[in-house]
Amino acid sequence: MNVHEFQAKGVLSSFGVTVPRGVVVESVEEVDRLLGDLAPGLVAVKAQIHAGGRGKAGGVKIGKTKDEVKSLVKQMLHSVLITHQTSPEGQKVNKVYLEEGVDIGKEYYISAVVDRSVGRVSIIFSSEGGVDIETVAKERPNMVSVVHVDPLYGFRSFHGQELCRRFGLGPKQVSGVVSMARKIYKVLVETDASQVEINPMAETSSGEFLALDAKIAFDDNGLYRNPEIAKLQDPDEYAAEELEAAKHGLSYIKMDGNIGCMVNGAGLAMATMDIIKYYGGEPANFLDVGGGANQEAVREAFKIILQSGVKGILVNIFGGIMRCDVIAKGIIESTKEIGVDVPLVVRLSGTNFEIGRKLLDDSGLGITAAADLDEAASFIVKMVNERR
């Protein structure tokens, strides 16, 4: 689960990270009332969306006067930002964060991330902040330092010392970086986050270290034990289909194609999307019904897929624990109830798959039962293209 910058800073602040004072506005009228809570001077006006690259897209501006701040808020609110991390349609701005200006002496980058490749928490630090860290790592790898923290022992001061070693920082700067690294590690572990990023981390002219921008991604599987974190979810930042899927325990991600996918298992779902593209089609979604899907889950999955206006649907089920005949019955009943009026191709493999295929063939609903995934993908792409 992603959160807005102002929410991420609220979490960081609760763990002792210094952040500039700021207020959130959802209308221009709120500016007059809330701007007084900030110190006089420059104000950073920041569009709040769940995507990076806001600055280059015009989503971060500096206001010098109240009138200028109000004008910037008016421009941003309800506008659509398109960045390298959004879809081509962009994301609508429903909130704007107003933040006190900071006297910046130096900018850095620091993050903590669950690194599955090493089975550790990786702390990443760079003396170049406020820029895309992937670009820095690619073009100037000597400017990025990484340490791996064993969760059995946790973060230690020597980890922080190692982060700073190559950058020639003074004792006070090293102390500031080590302190920040320790805090973000604690945030990551105690909130079940998968990533905590501060970019840039600013060193002020007085030597104080603070978070100028922040991003936190939380593991959805840990939200049950972090109810206060779960409350931070902003429904406006998610597609309606994604929210509906979550209610029914389905994993759904909306995409830009026109072929709906219903699959059991994340790996199989990704392989299904890949093979659709291989045959020249475009998947409309990632939808994992899970290993224990029943007829109700299949019915809800069909409803969600059809909300997107797809031109065809590919169902790819491997029956391990699940029985393919039960899934076939669910597909048939759902098709009758909902009225699926687009081409539907089903590939069943595993437990009772022969029975399942026969049920589909005998249903009289025009459902195409494919023998394997290659055949299924080629069938659905061809059918969709023929209907254009």
UniProtKB/Swiss-Prot annotation:
It catalyses: succinate + ATP + CoA = succinyl-CoA + ADP + phosphate; GTP + succinate + CoA = succinyl-CoA + GDP + phosphate. The keyword S-adenosyl-L-methionine does not apply. Mg(2+) binds at N199, D213. Belongs to the succinate/malate CoA ligase beta subunit family. SUPFAM superfamilies: Glutathione synthetase ATP-binding domain-like (SSF56059), Succinyl-CoA synthetase domains (SSF52210). GO terms for biological process: succinyl-CoA metabolic process; tricarboxylic acid cycle. Residues 9-244 form the ATP-grasp domain. Keywords: ATP-binding, Ligase, Magnesium, Metal-binding, Nucleotide-binding, Tricarboxylic acid cycle. Pathway: Carbohydrate metabolism; tricarboxylic acid cycle; succinate from succinyl-CoA (ligase route): step 1/1. Binds 1 Mg(2+) ion per subunit. GO terms for molecular function: ATP binding; magnesium ion binding; succinate-CoA ligase (ADP-forming) activity; succinate-CoA ligase (GDP-forming) activity. Substrate binds at N264, G320, I321, M322. Pfam families: ATP-grasp_2, Ligase_CoA. ATP binds at K46, G53, R54, G55, E99, V102, E107. Heterotetramer of two alpha and two beta subunits. It is an enzyme of class 6 (ligase). Its EC number is 6.2.1.5. This is Succinate--CoA ligase [ADP-forming] subunit beta. Its cofactor is Mg(2+). One of its GO terms (cellular component) is cytosol. Succinyl-CoA synthetase functions in the citric acid cycle (TCA), coupling the hydrolysis of succinyl-CoA to the synthesis of either ATP or GTP and thus represents the only step of substrate-level phosphorylation in the TCA. The beta subunit provides nucleotide specificity of the enzyme and binds the substrate succinate, while the binding sites for coenzyme A and phosphate are found in the alpha subunit.
